[in-house]
Amino acid sequence: MALEKLLRSIPKVDEILKAPELQDYLNRYQREIITRKVREVLDELRTGIVSGQRQKPLEFQEVVNLAQRKIESFFLPPYRRVVNGTGVVLHTNLGRAPLAPEAVEALRKVSGSYGNLELDLTTGKRGSRYDHVVEYLCELTGAEDALVVNNNASAVVLALSSMAFGKEVIVSRGQLVEIGGAFRIPEIMERSGAILKEVGTTNKTRIDDYRKAINENTGLLLGVHTSNYKIIGFTESVEIADLVKLGKEKGIPVMWDLGSGSLVDLTSYGLPYEPTVQEVLAAGVDVVTFSGDKLLGGPQAGIIAGKKEFVAKMKKHPLTRAIRIDKMTVAALQATLMLYFERDFLSKIPVLRMLTEPPEKIKKRAQKLYRKLLRAKLPAEISLDEGKSEVGGGAFPGTYLSSYVIKINPHHLSVEKLAKALREENPALLGRIEEEKFIIDLRTVLEEEIDYCKRLLEKHLVGDRQ
């Protein structure tokens, strides 16, 4: 009898739909989707009653509030902007490289209109979508030709399939990396149709290891830049120039997967040496592959640059169409590459600006936020301290950049609860938790985001106390 009474307390769908709180949603969205969300709430309540989790009759307003929250949650975009206070510049989970304003504007112009993606406006005949970026890539890298696909893993698969299908590809055992998401070089190679031939050991590989492994079925010598981990101690690896020399001696092409792939030597900004795309190609490598959304600072893309004879063959490969880039990637990449020709490109490309920004400038932003938080007299212990940022994106492993951070120790709620509340905002604010304090690293927080950070912290620190 008690169960029946509880079930009878569940309002009807039509009654909920008449509630004033839902009228704006009904005016804006299709009635069917709002009705479906209301039914989902009622079904959940019914299940809770039958299972014994709910033992009190339902109040009508309570159900309306639940329905409203369900609808709001549904229409809140799952993919939304995030203020990055983690200090990780190329945060994979946050989309890696933020685009430069010029690239964003290029996206805006082409995404909402038509464009000459595959049309030569001079001749009026069909063109190639790759023409929009190939000239810039060749000019910047010194390559004879270039091709862009949807990501670097695709670039590697395409290059291997085109250059060494059914043939052996010799690679050092110490370079058989996992590139993220459980995707590993051996598995990628298998899908390409190439045959993996490992040489050397995890910590030591010599040029003679490659030489001894070469036979009549060798199709390619492959080097993989281990940008996402570092082996130290008793190690030895083969220099790019030595592998190129062996390749020329034996008439075997050499390919190098650079992964993060920088066009800029960042050693003068406190980062360790990493070979640039230009240096690898200048050393004589036939084909190099790298990402567009890491150190380059552009959209997600896999870039293939190198000798014309190899790249031209890839452009005709059947796989190329399956992994080609769309008009938005073309526009964003073209705009990003154009910035590299400007004198002040380091300050215009967000990733490079963040990586090369002096700690003194970061400190000024940190002081600005710190003063705002102190003036707000929030119920928390707040301090400004030196900190360490990371490059991220599988680049420069074990390398930290000097930065400045705000540390927050809430008085009336746990640091985990604060972090969760900030994550659920729109835009979300992400930081990191260290020693029971919420940390905001100002290296990755933009000047225009400081006031927003202050408002969110005030909302959740003061709001929780009230």
From Swiss-Prot:
Keyword DNA damage: no
Pfam families per the UniProt record, alphabetical: Se-cys_synth_N, SelA
N6-(pyridoxal phosphate)lysine: residues bearing it: 294
Highest taxon listed in the record's lineage: Bacteria
Enzyme class: transferase
Compartment(s): Cytoplasm
GO biological process: conversion of seryl-tRNAsec to selenocys-tRNAsec; selenocysteine incorporation
An annotated GO cellular component: cytoplasm
Cofactor: pyridoxal 5'-phosphate
Keyword field contains Cytoplasm: yes
GO molecular-function terms, A-Z: L-seryl-tRNA(Sec) selenium transferase activity
EC number: 2.9.1.1
Alphabetical keyword list: Cytoplasm, Protein biosynthesis, Pyridoxal phosphate, Selenium, Transferase
Pathway linked to the protein: Aminoacyl-tRNA biosynthesis; selenocysteinyl-tRNA(Sec) biosynthesis; selenocysteinyl-tRNA(Sec) from L-seryl-tRNA(Sec) (bacterial route): step 1/1
Record field: catalytic activity: L-seryl-tRNA(Sec) + selenophosphate + H(+) = L-selenocysteinyl-tRNA(Sec) + phosphate
Protein task: Converts seryl-tRNA(Sec) to selenocysteinyl-tRNA(Sec) required for selenoprotein biosynthesis.
Family to which the UniProt record says this protein belongs: Belongs to the SelA family.
Protein name: L-seryl-tRNA(Sec) selenium transferase
Source organism of the structure: Carboxydothermus hydrogenoformans (strain ATCC BAA-161 / DSM 6008 / Z-2901)
Recorded name of the encoding gene: selA
